[in-house]
């Protein structure tokens, strides 16, 4: 069974392990790659939890929540992807990365997790009380055909190409 779970301290080890499997890829930045585990637990996770609640946001940022995609059929604590949901957009995000960024664990790519996880992430976004836009905006690099396919599989359309 696939499910999304917010970043939290209880699952810190498997979350940290996930971040060590990939570095910046296809426009998704990994600020936690090679971060030591103690710093991840004591600083990174509490800060992400605050950001998800709109607390102590740097200027120009909007609340965003990190959701890990788990597949219980692969393993009880197996993270197969990460979906970063921005609760609403400012001008920068509207013209930039959009509402949802995501990455699938390198070991689990090509298995449909992107499509299924994005569907769950879209449902989460629509449930958020501060989501006010009429449409959900997503963006991917032109060279990232797999991500474009994931978006199209979830009812997306190509608005424009840069």
Q: Over which residues does each language-model region extend?
A:
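GNAT-family acyltransferases
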Residues: 1-99
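Short aromatic/hydrophobic contact patches that present stacked aromatics
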Residues: 3, 101, 137-139
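Amphipathic alpha-helical recognition patches that constitute DNA-binding helices
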Residues: 14, 99, 135-137, 146
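A short, internal acetyl-CoA/4′-phosphopantetheine-binding micro-motif in the GNAT/acyltransferase core
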Residues: 70, 87, 99-110, 141
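Conserved acetyl-CoA-binding loop-helix of GNAT-fold acetyltransferases
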Residues: 101-104, 110-125, 148-153
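Helix N-cap/coil-helix junction residues
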Residues: 113, 130-131, 156
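Conserved GNAT acetyl-CoA-binding A-motif
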Residues: 127-140
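Conserved active-site alpha-helix within GNAT-family acetyltransferase domains
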Residues: 142-160
């Amino acid at each position: 069974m696939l499910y999304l779970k917010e970043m939290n301290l209880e699952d810190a080890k498997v979350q940290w392990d996930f971040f060590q499997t990939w570095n910046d890829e296809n426009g998704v930045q990994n600020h936690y790659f090679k971060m030591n585990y103690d710093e991840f637990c004591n600083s990174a996770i509490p800060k992400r939890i605050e950001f998800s609640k709109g607390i102590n946001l740097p200027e120009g940022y909007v609340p965003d929540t990190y959701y890990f995609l788990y597949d219980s059929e692969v393993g009880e604590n197996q993270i197969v992807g990460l979906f970063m949901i921005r609760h609403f957009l400012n001008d920068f995000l509207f013209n930039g990365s959009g509402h949802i960024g995501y990455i699938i664990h390198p070991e689990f790519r090509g298995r449909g997790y992107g499509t299924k996880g994005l569907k769950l992430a879209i449902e989460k976004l629509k449930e958020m009380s501060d989501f006010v836009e009429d449409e959900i905006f997503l963006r991917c690099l032109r060279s990232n055909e797999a991500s474009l396919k994931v978006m199209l599989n979830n009812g997306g359309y190509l608005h424009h190409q840069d």
